[in-house]
Amino acid sequence: MLLNRDDLIKARAGYKKALDAQKKKILVCAGTGCVAGGALEIHAELIRLIEASGAVCQVSLEKEPHSGVVGVKKSGCHGFCEMGPLVRIEPQGWLYIKVQPQDCAQIIEESILGERLVERLAYKADDRIYPTQEEIPFYKKQTRLVLDHCGHIDATSIREYLAIGGYAALEKALFDMSADEIVKEIEESNLRGRGGGGYPAGRKWAQVSRQKSPVKYIVCNGDEGDPGAFMDRSVMEGDPHGMLEGMMIAGIACGASEGYIYVRAEYPLAVSRLETAIVQAREYGLLGRNILGTGRDFDIKISKGAGAFVCGEGSALTASIEGKRGMPRVKPPRTVEQGLFAKPTVLNNVETFANVPQIIRKGAAWYRSVGPEKSPGTKAFALTGNIEHTGLVEVPMGTPLREVIFDIGGGIRGGAGFKAVQIGGPSGGCLTKEHLDLPLDFDSLKKAGAMIGSGGLVVMDEHTCMVEVARFFMNFTQNESCGKCVPCREGTKRMREILERIVAGQGEAGDIDMLLELADTVSSTALCGLGKTAAFPVVSTIKNFRDEYEAHVMEKRCPTKTCQKLKQIIIEPGLCRGCSKCARVCPVGAIAGKIKEPFAIDAAKCIKCGACIEACAFKAVKED
């Protein structure tokens, strides 16, 4: 256990020497995606082969440095998820993609023993080999601050976190700054909450610090519920100590002695890594009573949620931690006044807390130098959808959407045309190619009718039906509605019913205007922020793709030929040989005709399964 500041400084220096002594390191991505692809088997095989070669393999960082050892580590997410499982070789910085256990022998023989690049495992594009991670276009335009440690250290080791300067910000906050100075530093940095609306974190901390209550709480929102979003999960898995350090600093600044991390149970790896980090921090005297001999107490507990989307809302989240049903309540009072257990509470999300140690260590002015003035810093995004390179990216606020999608993401998969990007999850909106040069910051997106939200970016190509996209998100929101307020409970249900009729070819004149009217009512009268933003995907798709809605309603036609019930399958008489094969495979008997004469489809019976299209050898059956 570290008893004082000197102990912490000595431990950090000792572990740094031990880490520097590992002249060769193998970092196996052990994020959820790569683990699913076999990363743990790769890690075990690398250890076995190194030991078999006679070299000294070091899995856990020792207290004392040892020369000539090869460090083999399970790191956090590297971000290039499309190419996993990933293995990074240091000190060269080589990144190997799509690694399998059978590749390990060549990696050891050539890269560790022979110090040569295994070219077949390196990333290739445009007839060029990109040996190092830093050279790969996916990484080249990123600025990784929050994700800086992910992929570079053992995510389960407090020793490695200390070795790279970990808990230096906590040390500074404990010994060199007053509570007011910490709050002022966060205020001056203009760090805005990374979980949704972008409320200034420093302002929230100041409000809680001014409360006279003897009991206060720090709560981290790790309930990442947006479809396709995995930024917070990756931070919790890859750099848990960084997030814990941010929470500890918030506790010192606001006078809180207890913190909670609310994380969904569907994130078992994140929960496991957090539990390990908390135990380690307690063992080292960085959590608990009398931290580093200062007389300050602060401890953290984990509360696992059951996956309800509405529990991402502040008052619903605190209710869930208390053991109640997760339902939003009327405000005021707000969480800064009466939050968890009716006490003043700082509630920020994972990425917000992960920014704090760097701000305290390097200063508010440094932080404001990254990104635009009103939205400084970086933002992590989960890049998914019809894009060449899906994964986790981090860019400075204000980076144009085009740069993220085309320069980092590699553009649209298969050479198709870009159509839209859904940003902000179910509470966000769809942006079009006219918005590609829009800077990704809170204010610019709000003006465009969207929001950053937690940071999900779902890219859609020209074959995507925007009416179906709106129906998908409305179905999600309606299913996740807590049902407490009528506007959200009933309004989203009516909107979903209208959208389902439209994609089924049963749309009526006036449906589009009714959707907009319902959207306005729900947005202006719903109880919580989730209800107020529930209609954003519908409003933005109508605004930007009204012609698609009109085609569905007025012409009973889906322009992208995506909506199953709007498909029309026909038989071209000039191509039909009358072989009857299509009629024989039709499961509902919708095709009839005479042998050696053109057959015909009864549109009323046809279920659009497409079996006849696959069966026809003459390509006479096709979608109209």
Residue ranges of predicted features:
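Ferredoxin-type iron-sulfur electron-transfer modules in oxidoreductases and energy-metabolism complexes
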Residues: 2-24, 40-72, 83-85, 90-123, ...
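Conserved phosphate/anionic-ligand binding catalytic regions in large, soluble enzymes, centered on
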Residues: 30-38, 82, 186-208, 250, ...
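Short amphipathic, charge-patterned alpha-helical segments
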Residues: 50, 246-248, 397-413
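Iron-sulfur cluster-binding cysteine motifs and their immediate structural context
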Residues: 83-87, 487-493, 581-600, 611-624
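Flexible inter-domain linker/hinge segments
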Residues: 122-188, 342, 348-363
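Gly-rich Lys/Arg/Thr-decorated short loops/hinges at beta-loop-alpha junctions or inter-strand turns
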Residues: 153-168, 220-232, 335-341, 382-387, ...
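Hydrophobic alpha-helical positions that pack around
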Residues: 271-397, 409
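C-terminal accessory/binding modules appended to enzymatic or scaffolding proteins
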Residues: 377-389, 395-397, 401, 559-603, ...
